[in-house]
Amino acid sequence: MKKPITPWTPMSVQEGEDCCSVSMWDRTYMVDKNVLFTSIVSRGNEILSAPMRLVGLENGEEIVWKEQSPFVMSGDEEQVTLCCSEESSTFIVNTALKIDFDGYCDMDIKIMPRGRTVAEEFGVDKVKPNEYSLDKLWFEIPLKK
């Protein structure tokens, strides 16, 4: 098992049913089922004014994310990796969040359409691909002033 260098302290992870808490030297990150931060506390001060969100419009309507399946992929005293897959009516999003012992975070978000996206060429039936439109997509990080 890797250990962080001095003066940093080992990381700790606590999993709940709907959230996960990752703590390291004087900082705690709380994430919910979609592995986005709901709280960042640094030196006793909350940094976020509201939870982070992935927001967008699909086919002209606001995206509603559902069927979330988060899990801790790996974790030791030096680094923790949290993952999640969630779906809307048209898209699938896979998120991986790596948090290091010094508080550095690396978030990888991949979005892809659900179902068929190209016409079937070699099948018996000619199936039309699902039509979809990703009109807008943005990431909200509401910081306190």
Model region roles, listed by residue range:
Residues 91, 98-145:
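Acidic (Asp/Glu-rich), glycine- and aromatic
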Residues 39, 82, 93, 106-107:
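Short hydrophobic/aromatic-rich beta-strand segments that constitute the beta-sheet cores
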Residues 7, 18, 93-95, 107:
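Residue-level marker for the onset of beta-strands and adjacent loop->beta junctions
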Residues 1-10, 16-88, 145:
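Acidic-aromatic substrate-binding/catalytic surfaces of carbohydrate-active enzymes
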